[in-house]
Amino acid sequence: MTEYKIVIVGGGLVGKSALTLQLVQVCIKDQYYLIEFQNNQFQFENLQNHYIDEYDPTVEDSRREVSIDDQTCLLNILDTAGQQHSNAQSMDAHWSTVFVCLFNYFNITSMYDEIASFREQILRVKDGAKDLVPLILIINKADLDHESQGSGNEGQLAKDSLSFHQSSAKSRINLEEIPYSLVRELRKELKLDQSSGKAQKKKKQCLII
């Protein structure tokens, strides 16, 4: 079974942990609603009561087996929430096969500059091998009122051929589409690499920022 290793990165409070939990269907169920995240704990509410589920993104790993286009694969998702910036910068990881950069509509105005910087650093540690660095952008919290935060950056991202999606971890918007897009992007890259006669095992590195 093919395993796809996914690193989710982004600034503070963009919803990395909530999205990770939703993608692997660990804690958040359809009948519950995420209220807040404080001190590495998620608080959920249903119609009857309140309760607390503990979650530590620095130790929890998240795996999900899925069938995509009649092929079964394993998604292994790394949530970088809680990592200090200095530690992340120096992290030498032979781990990731795809990067997910997460933003929300309240930091969208700085999104393009940040994604460009992140992509540049990935390419540097990947020795400039652009075709080996699948990168997908997710704009989270699509359920919130964001009209006042709008900008023209989405069009620029599309022009630069960056794949991006809108999502909501709370409302489960596009949560099933995202892993399908990730895997299909990876398979597409591998197929192109093989057709060029370049397919070979290479050491993987990633830089988390």
UniProtKB/Swiss-Prot annotation:
Modified-residue entries (Phosphothreonine), positions: T58
Residues in coiled coil: none
Family matches, as SUPFAM superfamilies: P-loop containing nucleoside triphosphate hydrolases
PTM comment: Phosphorylated in the presence of insulin.
Renumbered ranges of motif Effector region: 55-63
Lipid group attachment sites (S-geranylgeranyl cysteine): C206
Activity control: Alternates between an inactive form bound to GDP and an active form bound to GTP. Activated by a guanine nucleotide-exchange factor (GEF) and inactivated by a GTPase-activating protein (GAP).
Main localization (coarse): membrane
Domain of life per record: Eukaryota
Protein residues bound to GTP: 10-17, 79-83, 140-143
UniProt GO cellular component terms: plasma membrane
Record GO terms (molecular function): G protein activity; GTP binding
UniProt subcellular location: Cell membrane
Propeptide section residues: 207-209
Top enzyme category: hydrolase
Modification Cysteine methyl ester, positions: C206
PANTHER family: RAS, DI-RAS, AND RHEB FAMILY MEMBERS OF SMALL GTPASE SUPERFAMILY (PTHR24070)
Function: This protein is activated by the insulin/insulin (insulin-like)-receptor system. This transition enables the ras protein to interact with the lectin-receptor/lectin complex, a process which ultimately lead to an initiation of an intra-cellular signal-transduction chain.
Name under which the protein is recorded: Ras-like protein
